[in-house]
Swiss-Prot record:
SUPFAM superfamilies: WD40 repeat-like
Keywords, in A-Z order: Coiled coil, Endosome, Membrane, Phosphoprotein, Repeat, WD repeat
Source organism per UniProt: Mus musculus
Record keyword Metal-binding present: no
A Gene Ontology molecular function term of the record: phosphatidylinositol 3-kinase inhibitor activity
Basic and acidic residues bias (residue ranges): 333-344
Name of the protein described by the UniProt record: WD repeat-containing protein 91
Length: 748
């Protein structure tokens, strides 16, 4: 507690200095110096009591103890009153013993003179009045214990412990609880970091085990593939006689089959030696290598003879030109056997064989043939290739959980998390507003249905219990999510009834409101406008600044070259800058201190759908009707830093098709992209869920990092809350479903 008090004093002192309350600061310093409670430091309180005894200041000692009783001890229950009385008695006895030990009998007599009225009726003091008159009180059996060092130390320790327990148990103001909360927060963060490291370690271990298992499977498959028939695996060390003997012992059916030779069925024709072709061979498709021909002819001849060793030897007793020629031929055959065996183990043999058998088959038709005739080696090669492609860098995020909020029954227009990251406000096309929390459990806090159509939604920044709701009839409502009622409703403009966008300043003092005239076409029109054509929002509009407290209009911004509908607005972190995206494709940057447009530039061919500041606020990102995601440098008007093309399901208009030709089209209303806390990753919409891209690569292209998925209808708006330790991604779709995905950032 003492540390918390000391730190709070420093914070209060810093705050007073920041506010310029110098007189109050001087008064605070003076009172801290004269603080009798010593900042709730037990050691200093005990030291103060001992110092008063050492200077024989009995009056100050009595006053200080009375102050402690009045300020601290009075808060205790009555059961502790005997303990307090015993400590007070021991304190005065400690003072008396000290006066006798220092030969100040006059101070001892003074003590009894001043305290006689209070002590004479107390039984525990009856024997102590003679203490100043005893020649050797330290040897007296009644007082000897109190003159020992052990008793003095025991008293000091008892007093110290009593005060310590008292300070720990006494109620403290709310401002002092922050220290304990900070410690708990730090402890939780440390535990989270330990668990995070354990999680990553387990993932790495799982990845390693899977890799080892895959390698073992590959090795096992390779061993199975390389295990050749005995008569093939022993070719390199067989002599001619043994080869003839083996061939003669094989069944005659093998020699008569079109797939007569094991080598012949796998080796490509291009690999065979023309000099070893037998003139008595059959059709070209049945030809094999010269050695294979020898096997077949010898086996056919052996069919009419009696099998045995003699027959085998007689087959080799044919005419030979000479001993040297026979040796040379034998060596050539052995070399060819080794060559054929090596070719057998290559993966290209089966593919060439398949191409040889069906040369007329097209590429699309040849693929089934390849799959039919390929051996385990080719399959293994494909698996290995797929495995190597799968060895990508570790994902930047780990999906901890994905929950669904399903209390909407029509397409979502807006879905926003409040500043604290604890609650979500969602709005659908039927005018249903839901305010719900997701931590620790998903629970609806407030629900409301608007009679008039709603087009925009924004959380108030300072009082995060309030919602700003813009309608399609020219009004803005202030809704209290805790009281579950409308606090006020203001008319913006009757001529421009559509409130397309709302943005509340971070300081909470004001908000901007974009009002536009009725659209040129209906939202329910099934045909999306062509890129670059005159869009549905190419109508006049106004950008207004309103005071949040008084709910009165402060000013109207100038929109050059002509008033146009503003689709999207966003403030920077301190509210000094406002960026807007309009239906004419122009981005305008407003100086909120001067209340004027600082710069503007043509950004998109068509409407600007969504615009946001970068995390460092040196750039602005935008998504437009032309399906482009562009980064702009705000220090140089119109300077394009990077540009990327997005799929149509990320930019809209969003289309949901149904049975019998039913088609629902929704133009973008809410945020189309959101950033993580560091601005390195971006969440966008897609047809099946949110997509996370990596920003800021050297090639200045978007890199698809993670697909959140989970949706059956197109996602129309997203949000990314980083208020908690884990990031929370919100993706809302046209079927009324909102997916809440909790991500854990992988810290490298």
């Amino acid at each position: 507690m003492a540390e918390a008090v000391e730190r709070t004093d420093e914070l209060v002192r810093e705050y007073l200095l920041f506010r310029g309350f110098t007189h109050t600061l001087r008064q605070l310093d003076a009172e801290i110096k004269a603080d009798k409670e010593k900042g709730f430091r037990v050691d200093k309180i005990v030291d103060q009591l001992q110092q008063l005894m050492q200077v024989y200041d009995l009056a100050a000692l009595r006053d200080y103890w009375s102050y402690l009783e009045r300020r601290l001890f009075s808060r205790l229950e009555d059961i502790y009153r005997p303990t307090i009385n015993k400590l007070k008695t021991s304190l005065f006895r400690f003072y008396l013993v000290y006066t006798i030990q220092t030969n100040r009998n006059d101070k001892a007599q003074e003590f009894f003179a001043k305290q006689a009225t209070e002590l004479q009726n107390q039984a525990e003091w009856k024997d102590w009045f003679v203490l100043p008159f005893l020649p050797s009180p330290d040897t007296n059996p009644t007082f000897a214990t109190y003159f020992s060092r052990q008793w003095a130390d025991t008293f000091i320790i008892s007093l110290h412990n009593f005060l310590s327990v008292l300070f720990q148990c006494m109620p403290v103001p709310v401002i002092l609880n922050f220290d304990a909360e900070c410690q708990r927060t730090n402890q939780v963060q440390e535990e989270n970091e330990v668990l995070r490291q354990k999680l990553f370690a387990l993932q790495a271990e799982i990845h390693r085990l899977k890799k080892e298992e895959q390698q073992q499977e590959e090795e096992a498959a390779a061993l199975v593939q390389h295990k050749l028939p005995p008569y093939v695996s022993s070719m390199d060390r067989l002599g001619d006689s043994e080869l003839a003997l083996v061939c003669s012992q094989r069944p005659a059916s093998l020699s008569q089959s079109p797939r007569v030779g094991f080598l012949s069925s796998l080796l490509p024709q291009s690999k065979k030696s023309p000099s070893r072709l037998s003139p008595a061979q059959g059709p070209p498709q049945a030809q094999s290598s010269a050695k294979k021909d020898s096997f077949s002819s010898q086996a056919t001849k052996g069919k009419d003879s009696v099998p045995g060793a003699k027959d085998g030897k007689s087959l080799l007793s044919g005419p030979v030109p000479g001993e040297a020629s026979w040796t040379h031929q034998r060596q050539r055959r052995l070399q060819d056997h080794g060559k054929e065996r090596r070719e057998l183990l290559s993966t290209s043999s089966s593919q060439s064989q398949c191409a040889e058998r069906k040369p007329e088959v097209s590429g699309a038709e040849a693929e089934p043939c390849l799959e039919l005739h390929m051996g385990p080696v080719e399959v293994l090669a494909r698996v290995s290739t797929a495995g190597s492609e799968g060895d990508r860098p570790e994902q930047p995020f780990i999906v901890l959980s994905q929950e669904e909020y399903g209390e909407h029954h029509s397409s979502i227009m807006h879905c926003r998390v409040d500043c604290s990251g604890r609650r979500v406000a969602s709005l659908d096309v039927d005018g249903v507003i839901k305010v719900w929390s997701f931590n620790p459990i998903m629970q609806t806090k407030a629900s409301s249905i608007s009679k008039s159509p709603l087009l925009s939604l924004e959380w108030a920044t300072k009082r995060d219990r309030l919602l700003l709701l813009g309608s399609g009839v020219g009004t803005v409502r202030l809704y209290d999510t805790e009281a579950k009622k409308n606090l006020c409703e203001i008319n913006i403009n009757d001529d421009m009834p559509r409130i397309l966008s709302l943005a509340c300043s971070p300081n909470g003092a004001s908000f901007v409101c974009s009002a536009a005239a009725p659209s040129l076409t209906s939202q329910t029109d099934s045909s999306a406008p062509d890129i670059g054509s005159k869009g549905m929002n190419q109508v006049p509009g106004k950008l207004l600044l309103w005071d949040t407290k008084t709910m009165k209009q402060q000013l109207q911004f100038s929109l050059d070259p002509e008033p146009i509908a503003i689709n999207c607005t966003a403030f920077n972190h301190n509210g000094n800058l406002l960026v807007t995206g309009a239906a004419d494709g122009v981005i305008r940057l407003f100086d909120m201190q001067q209340h004027e447009c600082a710069m503007s530039w043509k950004a998109h061919c068509g409407e600007v759908y969504s615009v946001e500041f970068s995390c460092d606020e040196n750039a602005v990102y935008s998504i437009g009707e032309d399906r482009k995601f562009i980064q702009w440098n705000i220090h140089k008007s119109g300077l394009k830093v990077s540009e990327s093309n997005l799929p149509s399901d990320a930019t809209g208009p969003f289309v949901l098709s149904g049975y019998s030709g039913y088609k629902q089209v929704q133009v973008p209303r809410g945020r189309l992209f959101a950033f993580d806390s560091e601005g390195n990753y971006m969440l966008t919409c897609s047809a099946t869920g949110g997509l996370i891209y990596k920003l800021g690569s050297e090639e200045k292209v978007l890199e698809n990092c993670l697909s959140l998925g989970g949706h059956r209808a197109p996602v129309v708006t997203v949000d990314w809350s980083t208020a908690m330790d884990c990031g929370t991604c919100l993706t809302a779709s046209m079927d009324g479903k909102i997916k809440l995905t909790t991500l854990l950032a992988h810290k490298l």
